[in-house]
Regions:
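Right-handed parallel beta-helix/beta-spiral solenoid domain characteristic of secreted/periplasmic
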Residues: 69-71, 155-161, 166-226, 247, ...
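Right-handed parallel beta-helix
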Residues: 178, 182-187, 209-223, 234-247, ...
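C-terminal accessory segments
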Residues: 497-556
Length: 556
């Protein structure tokens, strides 16, 4: 119920929407169409919009064949069982008013197992003879296998591996045959504990192998320090989990990675992370050392103690001479991030010249609200790009920031130092790195420190080591077609053109509904970007033009 409720909140409409459904992502990308419950194969969950509040005559096709069963059907989430008619090909949701976009799915080989509180690890793990523990499942699975955790499954104690974790993972699947542990439809299943082991799920490479290519989906994940910590683990897919670490502290994150790449982090609710006086080095979501090829989308990250909502930061590891390089090929999109002690997002060590670094279709509000952490350090913005380099060559090229909505950024009124409160900030660490901003809405608010409104920008000149004035020819930020409101006129920097300076007319700011009203000056003021749809899946451009911010106006 928790997971369905928060996802519906993220996607809640602000009026009537187009009736044709839109798919965002699925938990599984492959699975068998036989075996498991009723010999009808794997259960798959898709997330999106406009599926309808009840199934009625709607259905799902996989490679042209209809699914066998539908235990969950809501407007934003559908769970179905593949069935014998499913084939490799396009996965499509069909409703009376039309068909969704397609996402690929592969019908593959693999076994299906079940874990239940009433099961026994001496049984065979079938639907009618389930195992009792996820440890048994972990130790028994082969590449391509799927285990479903039934309602009430709780792997909360230390698993006895010696790694201070509830579930240690040291082996893996293959790119075309991952291992998957998924919550059974409508089940609440838990891994980790806020008062138990340090980590809920922990990975560590073993001699002769790496814990690569896993799917973890639909769980309640908890940890005293981290709900999930990936080390040397590639190709993971973390989908639709409820993640929280209210006792977290230290140099870590409630979800964190080291030397782990090609990750998909989709549709998770990360909330209430860090204890009240947590360290500045503690973050909600932390993609760490040499973690590249990251796709971070459709998550809600909220109520963060310590410091950042999302931290991208690479630092050398002891005994690894070439570790800690700048990070690249990073997509952060379609997220809602709010109520963070420091920045909503920090892209600390990035190099877009090696692979794009893009931030788009996000809603970020009340980020950088303070108070001080014990170290009295941090930054207070919606997005901060320091330009650090801890190992290797400095970053260069453009960090692309487009089609986002930012509200109330950097409101901490008692920072320990100046020029770090803003909506967007650049630290000047590399003279060859810059921000390109397009189609964003930046709505700032007043504080006791900034009675005329918190600054829109804080862009440090790498040469002078001072913040650029609003009218400076400051080349470390460029772009066009942004709306600035709440802190006076827009920046006069000649590298920022086509700005709008007016109230964007959101539907309901007090309820954090940042959809646009029909008369909004943000309508039809954008330029084309690579973002074909908005955060709701509504197409951008065309006859209606491109609106500014994370949401396209839908006609009502």
């Amino acid at each position: 119920v928790l997971r369905i409720a928060w996802f519906a909140l993220v996607l809640a409409p602000a009026g009537a929407w187009a009736a044709v459904p839109h798919l965002f992502f699925s938990d599984l990308e492959s699975g068998p169409n036989t075996g498991g419950e009723s010999n009808a194969g794997a259960y798959v969950t898709v997330y999106g919009k406009d599926f309808g509040s009840a199934r009625g005559s709607s259905y799902v096709t996989i490679g042209g064949g209809q699914a066998a069963a539908y235990p969950v059907w809501t407007d934003t989430k559908v769970t179905f069982q593949l069935g014998a008619a499913a084939a490799t090909g396009d996965l499509i949701v069909v409703v009376p008013d039309g068909s969704s976009n397609a996402i690929p799915f592969t019908v593959s080989r693999g076994r299906i197992f079940f874990v239940s509180p009433g099961g026994s690890d001496r049984k065979n793990g079938g639907f009618s003879s389930p195992w009792r523990t996820l440890v048994k499942a972990r130790d028994s699975m082969r590449p391509g296998d799927i285990t479903y955790a039934m309602n009430g499954v709780a792997q909360t104690a230390d698993d006895g591996s010696g790694w201070n974790t509830s579930l240690l993972v040291r082996n893996g699947g293959h790119p075309a045959a991952p291992k998957a542990i998924v919550a059974y439809p409508n089940a609440t299943a838990t891994i980790g504990s806020v008062n138990g082991p340090a980590t809920g799920i922990r990975t560590a490479p073993a001699e002769g192998g790496h814990p690569d290519h896993w799917v973890i989906a639909g769980f309640v994940l908890r940890g005293q320090g981290a709900a999930m910590g990936l080390w040397g683990s590639n190709g993971w897919r973390i989908v639709g989990n409820d993640i929280s670490c209210p006792q977290g502290d230290g140099a870590a994150g409630c979800f964190d990675t080291v030397e782990s790449s090609a990750l998909k982090f989709y549709g998770n609710h990360v909330h209430d992370t860090g204890k009240e006086n947590a360290s500045s080095q503690y973050h909600a979501v932390y993609f760490g050392t040499d973690s590249n090829h990251l796709d971070i989308g459709w998550n809600t990250i909220a109520n963060v103690h310590g410091c950042r909502g999302i931290q991208i930061h690479s630092s050398p590891q002891s005994g690894e001479a070439h570790s800690g390089q700048n990070q690249y090929d990073i997509r952060i999109h379609d997220n809602v991030i709010h109520d963070t002690q420091c920045d909503g997002i920090i892209l600390a060590t990035v190099d877009p010249s090696k692979g794009p670094v893009t931030v788009y279709n996000n809603v970020i509000y009340n980020a950088g609200k303070g108070p001080d952490n014990p170290e009295r350090t941090g930054g207070w913005s919606c997005i901060y790009v320091p330009g650090y380099t801890n190992s290797g060559s400095a970053g260069s090229g453009a960090v692309e920031i487009f089609d986002n909505t930012f509200y109330g950024c950097g409101t901490f009124a008692k920072p320990p130092y100046s020029d770090q409160n803003a909506a967007l900030a650049f630290g000047g660490g590399s003279p060859d790195l810059f921000l390109r901003i397009r189609n964003n809405i930046i709505f700032q608010t007043a504080t006791s420190l900034f009675p005329a409104g918190v600054p829109y920008l804080a862009i440090w000149n790498p040469s002078t080591r001072h913040v650029c004035a609003a009218a400076d020819d400051c080349r470390w930020i460029q772009g066009s077609n942004n709306l600035f409101y709440g802190s006076g006129p827009p920046p006069a920097n000649p590298n920022i053109t086509g700005s709008v300076n007016a109230d964007p007319e959101f539907v309901n700011v007090s309820q954090h509904d940042f959809h646009l009203l029909g008369g909004s000056p943000a309508r039809r003021r954008g330029v084309d970007t690579v973002s074909a749809v908005d955060q709701d899946g509504v197409p951008r451009g065309g006859a209606e033009g491109t609106d500014l911010g994370a949401f396209q106006f839908t006609g009502q």
